[in-house]
Amino acid sequence: MDCLIANINENDQFLERLKESESLLNTFYQYDAMSPESFEQALNAPNNGREQELASVISNYMSDLELTEAQQINIDKLKKGAKVVIGGQQAGLFGGPLYTFHKILSIVNLSRQLNEEYNKEVVPVFWIAGEDHDFDEVNHTYVFNTEKAKLHKVKYHTMTPPESNVSRFIPDKDKMLEALDDFLVQIPETAHTNHLRNEVQHIIKNYASWSDMFKALLHIVFKEYGVLLIDAQDPKLRHLEKPILKEMLKKHDEVDRAFRQRQAETVEAGLAEMIQTDTNVHLFLHEDDMRQLLTYEDGHYYTSKSQTAYTLDELLEIVENTPERFSNNVVTRPIMEEWLFNTVSFIGGPSEIKYWAELKAAFDVLDVTMPIVLPRMKITYITKRIEKLLKRYDINAEHVIADGIDNDKNKFIRAHASEQFLNELDQLEAQQKETYERLAAEVQGNEDNKNLVEKNNQIHQSQYDYLRKRYFINIERENAISMKHFRELNETLHPMGGLQERVWNALQFMNEFGTDMFSPSIYPPLRYTLKQIIIKP
């Protein structure tokens, strides 16, 4: 595989400010993410003392997987106090969008670099957001149908979506297999298709919960890198979290005030407001088979749907006896993660690193240190077919990745149009406009005639627009194959108006290049970068 680094204009000014180590922006974080001194400081920070228990919890969570030597070594390193680079994602159907894989690759590569550059043990950890309950965000994925040159939505269909954590959801295996068939039927059969189908079918048949299927897929793909996996909703992890859960309940008012004040400060500094929540407790409680947000009012805590009232002592008793009933919201999840791990750096998506800027004061209330916050690497894949089409039409890949295909498509259509036809049409339109201006001047004193002329002019002008539009449409029809190629380029490099990794699913590339395409022996070695990476398999 070839690997290129591309300079693509960022529409996101936040990332540019981060790259430039803007002092105002850095006030909202613990560390300057661009400073080597920050890494030195984070790597040498004292550990929290929970590493042995945490390593035991992770080992237990991954016990249903066949661990590689690299994973077992990393569990041992974690137990002995190794720092971590961590990131996480919701459990998407068949792994979800490509950026999930790219987050893990970012975590792996930054961990390796820190090992090499600072001679410190750093372990890659991926946090599965199994506590989340928004099933609509994870129940579907997309596959590109080459024959039709369009994206196809593949969805797990259910009449009873879970109202609890995704980790508790047990999907229907037949419906999961149907979704897999729907995915694979859209793409060409290759030498790798049967193996890919068998791998995913094995996962569906041998794992029960939605997030465990997700875990098993990630393990197959990234086990050789030594990546450690943990589900936020793992019961043993919740038991380890009992002390901080109690503090979150006791100090919920301080946490809420600190968060809202810091959020107001970020908005005042010109940043967009990222977190929107009405709760003042920032924790969920599992009750009546539903994940319910807690809110505090008049001395009691109330569940959002059942409206059950609890005292603080009653909730603290639940924490002590069944902590797995609790889960975090967007405000407390990052704090929980960093309370557990000795983290050097958190790797997040663009939105994640923005909303972390609103949380520094909440971290401080609970005496938890915010790690270095960095965005995941952005990676786009250009296959030989796509590269061939780019060369055929003399199109710059970086322009399409950033802005889409419309400019190149319009140039192509214009190049196949008759300049004489268009020039004469323009002249005719201009002549008619002048004629109507003279007619309007002649009837200026009569309002009815003036309106009549204006209306008639509009009708004729719209006919010129229609003629021009239909003329270009007919050119598109005459060049239907090229138009299909342009759609293919756009849906591959700029799908849905954004980056490939936000839409495409990794299984599509694994079908073409092998289920082991992401393994260390095949995937190109990367160094962590904020620039766009282009990989040509």
Swiss-Prot record:
It is an enzyme of class 6 (ligase). The keyword Coiled coil applies. Residues 417-457 form a coiled coil. Keywords: Coiled coil, Ligase. It holds the Pfam family Rossmann-like_BshC. The keyword Ligase applies. Disulfide bonds: none annotated. InterPro entries: Bacillithiol_biosynth_BshC, CC_BshC, Rossmann-like_BshC. Involved in bacillithiol (BSH) biosynthesis. May catalyze the last step of the pathway, the addition of cysteine to glucosamine malate (GlcN-Mal) to generate BSH. This is Putative cysteine ligase BshC. The lineage of its organism: Bacteria, Bacillati, Bacillota, Bacilli, Bacillales.
